[in-house]
Amino acid sequence: MASPLLHLDGVTKSFGKVTVARELTLSVQPGEALGIVGPNGAGKSSLFAMISGDLRPDSGAVWFEGREVTAVPPHARTRAGVGRTYQVPRPFEHLTVFENVLVCAHQGAGLKGRQAWTHSMDVLDGTGLADLANTPAGRLTLLQRKRLEVARAIGTAPRLLLLDEVAGGLTEPEVVELVEVVKRLHTEGLGIVWIEHVVHALVKTVGRMVCLAGGDVVADGEPMAVLADPKVRELYLGGGPETGLTDEEGS
């Protein structure tokens, strides 16, 4: 088996008496698409922050492509090949869609001149935003802003893409559109870790799913097997249909 693209080795993080990651060990293989689910407060956002460098674990180590990056700051991890989105898109609203991606190509991927321009246009083509290239980001719909958030992350030329609740707030047809974008990126060989409450979007996209609760891994495996796990179903009791644990959404 190839060396993991990402490996978390016994990572622990606490805020006062609240532990958001407890000796958590997790690996992602090159080109793998992993979905992460769990109730609010499960430690999902903290996990992403430790992978991206926005948060440093109290103990344990984070490895990327065989190199320990536990103490590496976020901008350096981006340059190393880790791209991420945020739950609330915050593009440069006064810049066009193209300019938003171009900034990421310059600053995140270190691309210059024609290479940066070509890369940015390719990213817009791949995320369905080419027709909006000259549109100011402040005029975009929510779905378009979500697409731009993904495009900005892809603009940094990552080998690992962290998606943080990108389907949240979208209508079902919009979720379907976004899933197609993510699927396309995955088929190009990009490693993906996707946190999402709209779980049926994950089922249609990822090959593996992890459920977190209280900073621990509760279940890890094929998506439908994880969602059928009694421990996982207990966590989601009363969660409503948006949890994606119904047969209709899981099909």
Model feature map: region roles:
Residues A2-S251:
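Glycine-rich phosphate-binding loops of nucleotide-dependent enzymes
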